[in-house]
Amino acid sequence: TLNIMAGGTKEAFELALPLLKIMGKNIFHAGDLGSGNGAKICNNMSLGITMIAASESLMLAKRLNIDIKKVHEIMKNASGNSWPISVYPPLPGLIDGTPSNNNYKPGFSVGMMNKDLKLANECAKSVKALTPLGAMALEIYNKFCEEGNENKDFSAISKVVGGDAWNYPID
């Protein structure tokens, strides 16, 4: 389901709303012109960071020889929950129908996430906002793109932090 974040005057938003409802389910008026793009960039920066965090957590559990399915269930119901954990996990075998169960065929590609993280980094610099985790996520996704993974789903980033611990080929 497409989430739409729109910026502009309240009047312009109300005028566009019937068309936006055709395209998406969750529609938000983010504020003035440009605010929709800014909201999307902030949301996707958080998503990129949390996908890496979910990957790191599950990788650590794997290295500690703890059953990944048990850790996943615990995290879904505890303070470690996030969208990547509850809806879109980076490891196969946790939730049916996710890209991790389909050889990381993209829903949202590594290349698109990398683009959004670059935009977030540029925006942060332009307003002198400190986003060290966003900058680190950009470095990680950028390197993954340079290694030829830009067309994989962004959840395949688990391969970077998981290394050989996953033992799941993505090609």
Features from the language model and the residues they span:
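Short beta-strand and adjoining strand-loop segment in the mid-core
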Residues: T1-K21, I27-H29, C42-T50, L58-L64, ...
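Short coil/turn segments
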Residues: T9, D32, G80
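ATP-dependent carboxylate/acyl-activation modules
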Residues: K21, I170-D171
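A short secondary-structure junction motif
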Residues: M23-I27, S82-I85
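General beta-strand structural signal in soluble alpha/beta enzymes
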Residues: F28-G31, L133
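Helical "substrate-binding/catalytic lid" subdomain
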Residues: S35-D164, Y168
